[in-house]
């Protein structure tokens, strides 16, 4: 299992296929890791491996994964972007597509902000976002589903650090995508495709807002997971959306 190291951060990644690069991260909140793919709504590493060079990774400090590093209390979304862009640098990749499931919608927003000249197109699949009726749902998810196992293996990390980390992830911008503002998405001209969901951690309104605000965004039908024929057409729409945006110099190769 390949790893890349940058200072005191170690990232485990996998890749398959060939063609224009597609960085794709699974769901799971702060436990986003490669081993989650078999339970995803669809396994992008499998369905797109004949179309793109598919790259995935364990996110930093995900329980059950092999990526480790400091807890970036002061700049958590920036740190995730550092890890993701650092992996692309390590692989010698300049331009790429990005597709993020669940928490990956927040990753997508930050990558689009940090590297607009590198992310050629982005797909938001069942993105997390702020839910006004339950504004602490993601904070609670992290505290219940990530913290207990994480602190068992990292006794040097204090509860105060963890509380500050979760606060800075989900309460600094307690609206929309957490990682970027509505104003940023409104001005983002990168092509975006949105696959909505409608559960407390993946509010339908967040997906609608991304698709409504971003000037070059599209959104699929909803619901799209059933029947199987509709789900397959939705997956093919993602494929065609990305293929149509491969830079000409790469498409000609």
Summary of predicted features, one role per range:
Residues 58-62, 128, 223-225:
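Short beta-to-alpha linker loops that shape the active-site pocket of alpha/beta-hydrolase fold enzymes
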Residues 7-67:
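Conserved HGGG/HGGXW glycine-rich cap/lid loop of the alpha/beta-hydrolase fold
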């Amino acid at each position: 299992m390949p790893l890349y190291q940058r200072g005191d951060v170690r990232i485990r990644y996998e890749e398959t296929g060939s063609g224009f690069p597609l960085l794709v991260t699974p769901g799971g909140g702060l436990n986003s890791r490669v081993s989650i793919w078999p339970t995803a709504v669809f396994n992008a590493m499998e369905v797109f491996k004949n179309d793109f060079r598919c790259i995935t990774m364990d996110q930093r400090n995900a329980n059950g994964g092999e990526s480790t590093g400091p807890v970036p209390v002061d700049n958590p979304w920036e740190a995730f972007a550092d890890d993701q862009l650092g992996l692309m640098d390590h692989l010698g990749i300049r331009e790429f597509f990005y597709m993020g499931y669940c928490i990956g919608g927040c990753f997508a927003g930050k990558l689009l902000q940090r590297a607009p000249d590198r992310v050629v197109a982005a797909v938001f699949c069942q993105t997390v976002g702020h839910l006004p009726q339950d504004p602490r749902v993601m904070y609670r998810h992290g505290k219940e589903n990530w913290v207990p196992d994480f602190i068992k293996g990292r006794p040097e990390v204090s509860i105060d650090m963890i509380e500050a980390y979760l606060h800075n992830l989900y309460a600094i911008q307690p609206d929309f995508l957490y990682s970027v503002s509505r104003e940023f998405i409104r001005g983002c001209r990168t092509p975006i495709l949105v696959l909505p969901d409608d559960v407390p951690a993946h509010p339908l309104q967040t997906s609608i807002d991304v698709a409504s605000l971003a000037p070059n965004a599209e959104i699929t039908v909803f619901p799209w997971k059933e029947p199987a024929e509709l789900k397959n057409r939705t997956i093919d729409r993602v494929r065609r959306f990305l293929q149509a945006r491969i830079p000409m110099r790469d498409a000609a190769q």
